[in-house]
Amino acid sequence: MPSPAPLSAPRSPISREADAFVRTKIVATMGPASRTEEAIRGLVEAGVDVFRLNMAHGSIPEHEETLGRIRSVSAELERPVAVLVDLAGPKIRLGELPDGLVECVEGAEITFVRGEESDRADRFVTNYPPLVDELAVGDAVMIADGTVSLVVESKTSDEARCRVVQPGPIRSRQGVNLPGVKLSVPAMSQTDWQHAEWAAAAGADFVSLSFVRSPVEVTLLEQLLRTRGSRARVIAKIEKREAVDNLEAIVEAAGGVMVARGDLGVETDVASMPMVQKRIIRVCQQFQKPVIVATQ
């Protein structure tokens, strides 16, 4: 009588966790210090699966050179790695401030005005001309990743007067978030369209769309990529309240999703951020779409 086959030992929790990690990929953002072949090789050997090219910084020739090095190292090490081209999108930023820095004191009045620059510390300009038109009394204005907050107290056709609620220092070109304010700005600027066309021609594997608000925006980018012969997946970055409200439709339309915790944490209540993140991940699992959790 043959002896029974030996029972396999139960898999340890460590083994199960290791398998789960293999299914979890690492996305690394390229920067000036990591663009050399030596640095890229070290990152690939350390386990990077996807390299992100941030189109908000650098020129197309610089990114093209970096992408070429990534492909070269990938072939040399015989390890496939993907490239994600991240479009900048309509990020609202402050213009130039006097001396580059302003200390916002609690209770102080700050006025947003039209124009490209200001010579007064209490008068701010931005790169978004319709801002004054689209703000309303009572709206919150968050600056520098939400570390400084203002509230709109009054407005005219040419300016919006705000009161500092949460004080702190701000610098030129820092980001401005308007939680709950519906903006008329398109999802992609002319520069974004040019970058998307370059991504298609360069053979990018993923193209991410910033500040998505509706599935229509995702579809438009996908159509552009397909007409250029690209099979790149569109990654919808969830960082606006409107995107959370339209989450299921956006996830269904996209090739994948990024939980962009930085801007999303400012646009939503920070205390609810963990639950919002879990909801996004759960919906992506329901639609069997990859999901990236990124930034602070």
PLM features per residue range, with description:
Residues 1-295:
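Non-catalytic helical/linker scaffolds that mediate oligomerization, partner binding
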